Amino acid sequence: MPGTHLEMDLRALDVFACPECGAELRVARREEGGSQNGKIKEGQLRCTQCPATFPILRSMPRFVSSDEYAASFGYQWNRFDKLQLDKFMRNDLSRERFYATTGWPEHLEGQRVLEAGCGMGRFTQIALETGAEVFSFDLSSAIEANFKNNTDAAKVHIFQASIYKIPLRREAFDKIFCMGVLQHCPDVKQAFMSLIPFLRRGGEIAVDVYQRHEGVPPLKYWARPFARRMQPQTLHAVLRWTIPPLFEMKKALYKIPVAGEAIADLIPIGPLSHKPKLDFTDEELKEVKILSALDMLSPAHDHPQRIEDVRAWFEEAGLEGIQIKLGFNGINAKGKKPISPPEHHSRPNH
């Protein structure tokens, strides 16, 4: 299809950099029949300064050799690859969350945006609708689902990389966002700090992260130590075996006068309807609940944060215009990189 993004676009190569040493990358190899019109389906990138090489597989450069701690998300988003897409679920939930978190305008033509942790591309889609050029990465194989969901966009560049070793040129982005990701990183603060060097002066960054609550932890934190011992495939099978009948049981209990509703509320699968805001069928809602449970129980890391700590990160990063609030997903925070670098005052000689 003319104008579609089906291969790695070599015009974006000057934005990439070696994650090991920061030097430029060059195309070292192209598979026979694997490139056309300045785009590559299969091949290899090589650093111009150090021995590092990186494969291009199925049109996407890969800067990690495995999913590491994010393997559960790779499994999750390749199986639920449409369930949170606004256009598929007939709602604007992702759009609402994106704009509530970022506060950005709906038109970003001429700007370059970085998405850190893309999953299957629910927010990639919204960012692309602004007209911006979007670079989107994930540690996990969820990039395969994102690629499938957004291949009709001409200005998207999807790649697999670690948030701790981002393979891009510094100060190359007008805007950076990271949503639904930070709490699942081993070192949450360092994951946030790793994004700052890639933001241009005057550029904006917006993130969200789970909020830490004092007192008795939510139910999922009691279940996670047991659930995490299972492979994602096994946990998914258990949830698919248990949640649909629990849904039907809860639905039946609500019809029983007096005590039925109180008993039904003890079944920990959330509400049976989100109407009028979200008009799911029962079958769709069962799938949503299976996905939600898998998302809560399977990640290797889940580290909620305190508002004061998030504010301290933004201040330590030297950002200005800091705004922090509670919203979608917990803590929403944004800030701007100063146009002028900070002044360094040297000590007078005596």
Briefly describe each language-model feature range.
Residues 138, 160, 180, 209-211:
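Glycine-rich, histidine-containing beta strand-loop boundary motifs that form or position
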Residues 2-169, 175, 301-303, 309, ...:
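Conserved N-terminal segment of class I S-adenosyl-L-methionine
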Residues 174-187:
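A short SAM/SAH-binding and catalytic strip from SAM-dependent methyltransferases
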Residues 189-201:
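A short glycine-rich, Lys/Arg-flanked "PGG" loop and its adjoining helix->strand segment in the class I
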Residues 313-314, 319:
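Conserved, well-ordered alpha-helix/loop/beta-strand core segments that scaffold catalytic motifs
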Residues 210-227, 282-300:
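Short, glycine-/aromatic-enriched active-site segment of Class I SAM-dependent methyltransferases
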Residues 204-237, 241-244, 248:
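Conserved class I S-adenosyl-L-methionine
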Residues 232-288:
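Extended, charge-rich helix/loop segments that form flexible
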